[in-house]
Amino acid sequence: MGRKHYSSKKNRSKKGEFVNWDLIERKNENFEKYYRLQKLVTEDDFILLKQKLTEQLPTTFRITASIPHATQVRDYFIEHYYPLIENARTEDAKIPLPVSLPWYPDGMAFMLDISKEVIRKSPHLKALQEFLVLETEAGDINRQESVSMVPPLLLNVESHHKVLDMCAAPGSKTAQLLEALHKPTKKEDITTLLPSGIVIANDSDNKRAHMLVHQIKRLNSPNVLIVNHDASFLPNFHLSSPDGKKFLKFDRILADVPCSGDGTFRKNIALWNEWSLKTALGLHATQIKILMRGLQLLEKGGRLVYSTCSLNPIENEAVVSAVLNATRGSVRLVDVSSELPQLKRSQGVDNWVVCDSDLNIYPSFDTLPKELYEKMPPTLWPLPKKELAELNIQNCLRIYPHFQNTGGFFVAVLEKYENLTSSMKTAVDDNKVFLREQKLPSEQASKKRKQDTQETSSDSKLAEVKPKGKNGGNRFHELDPFVYIKEDDQALEKIYKKFGIDEAIIKKNQFFVRNVNGVPTKAIYISNDLFRNVIENNRNRVKFVHGGLKIFVRQDFGSLSREIAEKNGTCVFRVQSDGANLASHFIAESCLFHTTLSDLFILLDHEAVTIDDFPEDSLFRKEYNHLDLGSTLLHVDLAKEESVIKKQVYIPLWKSVRICNVLLSNSEKRTLKLQIEGPQSSIHKHNT
């Protein structure tokens, strides 16, 4: 029997109805019956697996690998928060200390064997909760289920790679891909912050694609582009090159496909009531299409990771083997048993039972009733064991919840060593032909078969999306299109002059705005050359949602300062906090104002300051009257100060005739205080 828990907590079911998760019995007879038929694990393991699925999921997070102070955040968490947790208790018991995930690189991920609800509600853990919230907002940590961290790690992304995340929302894996793209090899520099590679993150659902923006913006990357398409029909990305137009092929692709999610019982409690084999059966063909499309878009020599949060072979090995069988001679499964060596895993299985949604068993497609043909394609059934062995199906990874206290997950790492040929078609396509033959007269069916055999899945004839906009306009009707600023634009000229930007480091053609005129009226974004190439060659074929990094923002003067500013031709654009760190690497030293921690505290504690707010011996007071009207970038070297986190801080500063202020949100101020003073920070505790 599944355990019952009782409280007033409520959540939504798939239908959007409120349900009390704690009143749901952790049991589903059909789920148990189906997986006993599969015999994926031994009976003893199945008992452990079933029990683990009824238990609460631990809280896990990882430290952002691309920040230069990542090891400091790790050590800071251990030093300051372990003692707080060690002395904390819930109503029932002592709270266990966090543990570092043994398989995650450099000890940068942690597991707390308590639920997020306990952390949120326990007064003893208030400091921990605020650390998790503030550091997540700052982009220094990412709260993510541990097994979800595995697929991006196995992609081995490097800074020059062209990366595609086919089904990206909610974005935790996309964030990992970006971290890898930006990860410094030695020290942070302009090539680390603005590398040559790109991450294109796609989601088919418009709302989820926009939710993805919030997750990704925390990382302040100019190298990410979010698009909104059905992953199985992703359009080709065109590029211009010296030798003419060409298609963008990706070095790394993540296909974390839609699935039944039956590895997520521990966090999705409503699934105990809702689980049905019908979901997996309905998704199988879509999963094959997405994987096949991913391989078409993959560069020769590139790596693709296919993953699901399902335990079901018909969503996992059946999908992978169908595509491998169709692409023999071009794609292979990679043996990653030596990668992440402390991650406990099982091999892919070579035998499974195929049932209909009522759990009636069908040994082969030939035994299937005619009325189930459309719902159950031949690819559901396992290939002969010899063929599966030739495909190295054992190289797939199965991660079971009872192995290391996680959710359930499946991962397959594929490598494309030759381009796909025109004859490579999946059995799903063949099944469609078969179905039509059952419905059409013989002559008509013969013609249709000939037509289908002429269709292609080859790299040379990838699926095209034809522009349909009127007069060459954007057929997606973007409200805020990506338009690059003309290099002779007056506002851009003023920005370059104001901040002493060296065009040898940052070219003028890297800046764009989000309006149809291409005129910088509000925000200015920055990107790399590849990003621009993608944007300008795909306006009518790709639906762009978000991308680049907001680097400059227009800041209008008040009435008292406006006249002086206009008379002096003062630049009205200032550095945006999102891009302050990147800007510090290409603006002139004269545009940086170096100050002390004591001065910084005064600026953080006030909405606005005057010269009289600083003591007589203050460095800021001495230099105050020499500061230019408008924007300056404030710099504090915390490595030389009494600060918990020793890092370089760059903050936009705005000065008018009467006052001066730092342009940070309240949460940004609180996070900075927390990093300087630790959990005892007064601003952290009192939420000013």
Curated annotation (Swiss-Prot):
The keyword S-adenosyl-L-methionine applies. Gene3D superfamilies: Vaccinia Virus protein VP39 (3.40.50.150). The active site is at residue 309. S-adenosyl-L-methionine binds at residues 167-173, 203, 230, 256. It comes from the Eukaryota. It catalyses: cytidine(48) in tRNA precursor + S-adenosyl-L-methionine = 5-methylcytidine(48) in tRNA precursor + S-adenosyl-L-homocysteine + H(+); cytidine(34) in tRNA precursor + S-adenosyl-L-methionine = 5-methylcytidine(34) in tRNA precursor + S-adenosyl-L-homocysteine + H(+); cytidine(60) in tRNA(Asp) + S-adenosyl-L-methionine = 5-methylcytidine(60) in tRNA(Asp) + S-adenosyl-L-homocysteine + H(+); cytidine(61) in tRNA(Asp) + S-adenosyl-L-methionine = 5-methylcytidine(61) in tRNA(Asp) + S-adenosyl-L-homocysteine + H(+). PROSITE patterns: NOL1_NOP2_SUN, SAM_MT_RSMB_NOP. Keywords: Cytoplasm, Methyltransferase, Nucleus, Phosphoprotein, RNA-binding, S-adenosyl-L-methionine, Transferase, tRNA processing, tRNA-binding. Its EC number is 2.1.1.-, 2.1.1.203. It is an enzyme of class 2 (transferase). One of its GO terms (molecular function) is tRNA binding. One of its GO terms (cellular component) is cytoplasm. The modification Phosphothreonine is found at residue 54. The keyword Phosphoprotein applies. Residues 439-474 are annotated as: Disordered. It is found in: Nucleus; Cytoplasm. Disruption phenotype: Cells lacking both trm4a and trm4b show a mild resistance to calcium chloride. Its main location: nucleus. tRNA cytosine C(5)-methyltransferase that methylates cytosine to 5-methylcytosine (m5C) in tRNAs at position 34 and 48. Trm4a and trm4b methylate different sets of tRNAs. Also methylates cytosine to m5C at positions (60, 61 and 62) in tRNA(Asp). Belongs to the class I-like SAM-binding methyltransferase superfamily. RsmB/NOP family. TRM4 subfamily. This is Multisite-specific tRNA:(cytosine-C(5))-methyltransferase trm4a. The gene is trm4a.
